[in-house]
Amino acid sequence: MTNNISHNQKATEKVEAQNNNNITRKRRGAISSEPLGDKPATPLPNIPKTVETQQRLEQALSNNIMFSHLEEEERNVVFLAMVEVLYKAGDIIIKQGDEGDLFYVIDSGICDIYVCQNGGSPTLVMEVFEGGSFGELALIYGSPRAATVIARTDVRLWALNGATYRRILMDQTIKKRKLYEEFLEKVSILRHIDKYERVSLADALEPVNFQDGEVIVRQGDPGDRFYIIVEGKVVVTQETVPGDHSTSHVVSELHPSDYFGEIALLTDRPRAATVTSIGYTKCVELDRQRFNRLCGPIDQMLRRNMETYNQFLNRPPSSPNLTSQKS
């Protein structure tokens, strides 16, 4: 096995130099982040990719635990931040025991992964082909490399460092938090919660997607969660005679920032109407158990403003609580 250390160092330095122009590095192993105030953040790396390359990266990362939870917009930011690195056959890309924070996706070529145990000879444990990846633990942990990776053939890789990965997650988290806080401010039943509680709820909202024609909530069913529309639209229908579909009529149509089902945080009443997705719809949801864990029972919170509490508590069960209530 050839050990072309100088080439390996130059390639690694190329990746780190391009990323470090955009990210302030702290001491090794520390997580760097931008201030959460209004100061503009330093731009992330933005390296255009061909459609074919983007598709290969998408396929490579779709089943990777470090990326599978990201939404499409977040993955696209990751793709743009990845830097091209070239290695010759025989080059050592990663050396077991070394520190490193680079994650790689193979665009072309083959790599071999070796592990030495108890000071013994290196053992080939895996072959990684085009579309494969390695080094993902370096994105979040500062621990030494667990294996050695050697290029069997000339390889073309796309690399991402841990600081960039964490920065992307931080930027997206802050962006979502601000958006969700704005949504929550419009929910009448939550209007009187304080800033800390609103931030906690914004962080607790879970994304959920629905396809065209999919029923999100059904009239008469029990419910324990409420929804805010992030993207797309839904139609709200109600049966004048519950169970008689012929009496169903449209109550309203809801759009991004509208919400429905908020009374589920307060009572166990059956759903008063049916909500159906029109086209693809992206929502965020919050259930009563998660709400109570973060903020305590909502009835106690509403008692801060008895007028609001009585308004929701005394609402007739037949009154749909699924229409938007923008302030």
From Swiss-Prot:
Matching InterPro entries: cAMP-dep_PK_reg_su-like, cAMP_dep_PK_reg_su, cNMP-bd_CS, cNMP-bd_dom, cNMP-bd_dom_sf, RmlC-like_jellyroll
What does UniProt give as GO cellular component?
Answer: cAMP-dependent protein kinase complex; centrosome; cytosol
Alphabetized PROSITE patterns for the sequence = CNMP_BINDING_1, CNMP_BINDING_2, CNMP_BINDING_3
* Region described as Dimerization and phosphorylation: 1-65
> Where is the motif (Pseudophosphorylation motif)?
27-31
**A Pfam short name:** cNMP_binding
Domain of life from the UniProt record: Eukaryota
SMART domains reported in the protein's UniProt record: cNMP
- Subunit details: In Dictyostelium the holoenzyme is a dimer composed of a regulatory (R) and a catalytic (C) subunit. In the presence of cAMP it dissociates into the active C subunit and an R monomer. In other eukaryotes the holoenzyme is a tetramer composed of 2 regulatory (R) and 2 catalytic (C) subunits. In the presence of cAMP it dissociates into active monomeric C subunits and an R dimer.
Task: Please give the name of this protein.
Answer: cAMP-dependent protein kinase regulatory subunit
Species annotation = Dictyostelium discoideum (Social amoeba)
Q: What is the lineage of its organism?
A: Eukaryota, Amoebozoa, Evosea, Eumycetozoa, Dictyostelia
The gene designation is pkaR
